[in-house]
C-alpha cells in the first residue's frame, strides 16, 4: 500500500501544479467499485477478492457523467498488486481498452515489493499486450521505482504531443 500511495500522492501533486482547475475522482474497488473521498482513498484500503473490471467500469461511468473528453483532459491511473479473478480478465482488458480510447492518458502500475512473492501477473502481462499510444504499464518494486515509473507513465500523455 505504501508504494501505491506514494505513487498516487506524487501524481496528485503533479496534476495540481500542472493544471489550474483540477477535479480528481477516486475509485476504490474489490469485487465492486465505488467513488471514495480523497481521505478514504489515501487512508483506507479495500480487502477481499478483486474484479478489476468493476473499477474500470466505475471510472468510465464517472467520466461519462462529469468529464466529457471534449471538454476535459482526462487521465486515469490504476495501481494494483496484479491479482484479479481469471474470469474477469477479458472484461478488464476490454474496459482498459475503452479507458485508453477515452482518456488522454491511461496508466497501470503493478506493485510487487522486492522480497515478496513475485511473479508475472496475468494483469501486467495482459496489459503489456494492449496496444494504445496513450497507455503505459510500469512495475514498481521499491521506493526507488516510484519516480522513474511516474515519469514513464507521463511520457505517453497524448495531450502534450
Model-predicted regions and their roles:
Residues 1-161:
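Acidic, glycine-rich A-domain
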Amino acid at each position: 500500500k505504501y508504494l501505491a500511495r506514494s505513487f498516487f500522492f506524487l501524481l496528485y501533486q503533479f496534476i495540481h501544479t500542472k493544471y489550474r482547475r483540477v477535479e480528481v475522482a477516486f475509485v476504490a474497488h474489490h469485487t465492486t467499485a465505488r467513488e471514495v473521498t480523497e481521505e478514504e482513498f489515501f487512508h483506507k484500503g479495500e480487502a477481499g477478492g478483486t474484479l478489476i473490471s468493476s473499477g474500470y467500469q466505475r471510472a468510465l461511468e464517472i467520466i461519462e457523467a462529469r468529464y466529457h473528453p471534449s471538454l476535459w483532459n482526462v487521465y486515469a491511473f490504476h495501481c494494483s498488486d496484479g491479482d484479479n479473478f481469471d474470469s474477469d480478465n477479458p472484461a478488464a482488458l476490454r474496459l482498459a481498452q475503452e479507458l485508453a480510447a477515452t482518456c488522454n492518458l491511461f496508466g497501470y502500475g503493478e506493485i510487487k515489493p522486492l522480497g515478496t512473492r513475485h511473479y508475472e501477473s496475468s494483469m501486467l502481462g495482459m496489459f503489456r499486450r494492449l496496444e494504445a499510444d496513450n497507455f503505459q504499464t510500469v512495475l514498481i518494486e521499491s521506493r526507488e521505482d516510484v519516480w522513474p515509473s511516474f515519469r514513464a507513465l507521463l511520457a505517453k500523455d497524448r495531450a502534450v504531443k
